[in-house]
Amino acid sequence: MKLGSVGLPNVGKSTLFNSLTKAGAESANYPFCTIDPNVGVVTVPDERLALLGDFYHSKKVTPAVIEFVDIAGLVKGASKGEGLGNQFLANIREVDAIVHVVRCFEDTNVIHVDGSIDPIRDIETINLELIFSDLEILERRIAKVTKTARMDKEAAKELDFLQKIKKWLEDGKMAITMELENEDEEAWMGTYNLLTQKPVIYAANVAEDDLANDGADNAHVQAVRKYAAEQNSEIFVICAQIEEEISELDEDERKMFLEDLGLKESGLEKLVKASYHLLGLMSFLTSGEDETRAWTIKIGTKAPQAAGKIHSDFERGFIKAEVVNYQDLLDCGSYAGAREKGLVRMEGKDYVVQDGDVILFRFNV
């Protein structure tokens, strides 16, 4: 999974990136301190891994990961080259979802490029730049398809669809909110790689005082919640400054720190939960003496395709999957014990993998 973070300058975007990835992206109190997209890897917290690793005495434990791309702070006119220009918008065309960091805290010591705190205005500023960037993509595609539309019925149908999307965006609406009417439209939309078609997770960056009650008393957060609900987007509340402090602590210290703040989970855990929910993802597990590992797949993935996440040969030569639920395995105390109780199942190519399945794939190539 690959996420791209966007936001106006000085909303706490790079601070959040630093804390989540520990990649050390430059962060400063002035616009455009991030000149190139920073890329980091975020490990997906999963308490099942350590327990399963101990169960098998695994030499290595490998969590699932999220690739996180931090894009330079955007401003009005970014799609036309203002600020750091639209080349930075191109850097997020390949991500699975966009994490839009919005400022929901008041602090006179941290400047705002527009002089006041208004997260909805900020969101719409960024969205407009994404729309402008997508319109350029559509204009180029329209020019290409127009050349063959007179002689080609399929091209003519696509041209009509392109004009429909163009009108939608020109009305200030995001492509993801447009209802697609048939399989052709779904297929065409999938090839354009539009920024406004990508799912969005809003990270409401608040002051420490707003963390414990999840921003319930923060009018800015409530405005973003309402906006996100209308867009079928996810939102989580975070304090980038606190996350930066947490990132320097070990696991035990981190838990104590969160408890002192009245928090049950870190910002990273909130981000992962929101990402998995928005994108319809889950994890299955493989485990043995050499390695215990989590693998991220789409909900509804069948066994051969899940096997292919490990290696293409596993999918190509798939025979069957030996499956046991993670909790059942631990409760039985051994794999043999789980097998004796009939909890280890042999599943074929039509089996839909479930979250927390521990799987041993049988294959032959």
Residue ranges, per PLM feature:
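Short capping/connector residues at structural and topological boundaries
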Residues: 6, 32, 37-40, 47-49, ...
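Conserved Switch II/interswitch segment of TRAFAC-class P-loop GTPases
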Residues: 40-45, 72-82, 93-155, 168-182, ...
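C-terminal-of-GTPase-core extension/linker across diverse P-loop GTPases
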Residues: 2-6, 17, 146-352, 359, ...
